[in-house]
């Protein structure tokens, strides 16, 4: 069983075999209108009906993309992986994007005050989404709060009749101690995913998520079949490893590079990050390192390849690491400098969009308001 609210390490191969997640192979990638590095590098590794989504798109049929945000903490590079996908589909394929803000889920599952959740959603997430390149024009993107979108609330109440307590309990491991708001959260998520069909008519919705969210997709696909709706497609990306190992997490600051970290803080975190190098310099030179266990190399693959010379440079660094011809300090300096550049640029873009955000969000009737002390 996968717990969407508490996951540390994932056996991707087991999940693929046990739950029927299909690998994204070259045949699927060829359906894209252009190459997408997150797929080519194996970061987005699996799917359900992604090929059907792409075929519908190529046939000129209506499609949309939806992926939500949980406003319970600071936004980090792991979250950026989702935004990069949304930006690709919107900017490169001109597909409309839906961004639900899971404020009700944050309230019930994380004990987050709603007003606090709304502030975090605006200051940490919506602002960074826009700075990372997502166009907030309401014709191209809909941002909304679960607590405000009546279509989602009505649909959730109706869909609840399609599920038994045993189904939900067995899917998520809920117990007699689980509050009913938390237990109802998966049904609200199903309504999030299916409601674009209520608004725009039957069509395939793609949901790009981390693999921990697959229980929601399996449940939603079962409900869609019962409701004679088109089953959502989904893609699954690998989690970024935390700087100290395990999963990168907002609740563990030393594991994450936050998008609002200043450049020097980011460099220091990288310098202290876990690597795949030898125990000593001599051992590393003699036996080489293991880039597959190196957080610093992973940062290059996920976010920095274009900054350091592309895939060819990645292959060169990987080879040199294995042969002991490049040491960890060199990689850390390279990654630290590249990250500093990204964070500086992101801060400038946040400032550029900050003054426009109140007007942009006012065009989304179910979105949170910008705080008065903005």
From Swiss-Prot:
A motif ('HIGH' region) lies at residues 71-79. One of its GO terms (molecular function) is ATP binding. It is found in: Cytoplasm. A motif ('KMSKS' region) lies at residues 247-251. It is an enzyme of class 6 (ligase). InterPro entries: aa-tRNA-synth_Ic, Rossmann-like_a/b/a_fold, Trp-tRNA-ligase, Tryptophan-tRNA-ligase_arc. It catalyses: tRNA(Trp) + L-tryptophan + ATP = L-tryptophyl-tRNA(Trp) + AMP + diphosphate + H(+). It comes from the Archaea. The keyword Lipid metabolism does not apply. Keywords: Aminoacyl-tRNA synthetase, ATP-binding, Cytoplasm, Ligase, Nucleotide-binding, Protein biosynthesis. Its EC number is 6.1.1.2. Gene3D superfamilies: HUPs, Tyrosyl-Transfer RNA Synthetase. SUPFAM superfamilies: Nucleotidylyl transferase. The keyword Lyase does not apply. CDD domains: TrpRS_core. One of its GO terms (cellular component) is cytoplasm. Its main location: cytoplasm. One of its GO terms (biological process) is tryptophanyl-tRNA aminoacylation. Belongs to the class-I aminoacyl-tRNA synthetase family. This is Tryptophan--tRNA ligase. The lineage of its organism: Archaea, Methanobacteriati, Methanobacteriota, Methanomada group, Methanopyri. The gene is trpS.
């Amino acid at each position: 069983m996968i717990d969407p609210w508490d996951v540390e390490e994932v056996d991707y191969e087991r999940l693929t075999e046990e739950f029927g997640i299909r690998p994204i192979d070259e045949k699927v990638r060829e359906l894209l209108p252009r190459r997408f590095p997150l797929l080519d590098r194996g970061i987005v590794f699996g799917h359900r009906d992604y090929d059907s989504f792409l075929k519908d798109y190529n046939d000129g049929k209506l499609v949309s993309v939806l992926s939500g945000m949980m406003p319970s903490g600071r936004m980090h590079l792991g979250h950026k992986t989702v935004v990069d996908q949304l930006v690709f589909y919107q900017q490169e394929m001109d597909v409309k994007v839906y961004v639900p803000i899971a404020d009700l889920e944050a309230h019930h599952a994380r004990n987050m005050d709603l007003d606090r959740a709304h502030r975090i959603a605006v200051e940490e997430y919506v602002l960074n989404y826009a700075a990372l390149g997502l166009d907030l024009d309401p014709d191209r993107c809909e941002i909304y709060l679960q607590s405000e979108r009546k279509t989602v609330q009505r649909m959730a109440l109706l869909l609840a009749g399609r599920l038994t307590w045993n189904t939900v309990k067995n899917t998520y491991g809920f117990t007699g101690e689980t509050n009913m708001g938390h237990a109802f959260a998966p049904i609200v998520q199903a309504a999030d995913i299916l409601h674009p069909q209520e608004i725009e008519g039957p069509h395939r919705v793609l949901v790009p998520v981390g693999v921990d969210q697959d229980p929601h997709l399996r449940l939603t696909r079962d409900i869609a079949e019962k409701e004679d709706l088109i089953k959502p497609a989904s893609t699954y990306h690998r989690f970024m490893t935390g700087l100290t190992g395990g999963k990168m997490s907002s609740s563990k600051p030393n594991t994450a590079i936050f998008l609002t970290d200043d450049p020097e803080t980011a460099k220091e975190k990288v310098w202290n990050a876990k690597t795949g190098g030898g125990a000593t310099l001599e051992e590393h030179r003699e036996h080489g390192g293991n880039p597959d266990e190196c957080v610093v190399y992973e940062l290059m693959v996920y976010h920095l390849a274009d900054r350091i010379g592309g895939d060819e440079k990645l292959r060169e660094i990987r080879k040199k690491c294995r042969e002991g011809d490049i040491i960890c300090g060199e990689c850390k300096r390279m990654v630290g400098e590249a990250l500093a550049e990204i964070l500086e640029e992101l801060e400038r873009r946040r400032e550029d969009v900050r003054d426009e955000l109140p007007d942009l969000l006012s065009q989304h009737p179910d979105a949170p308001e910008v705080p008065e002390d903005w």
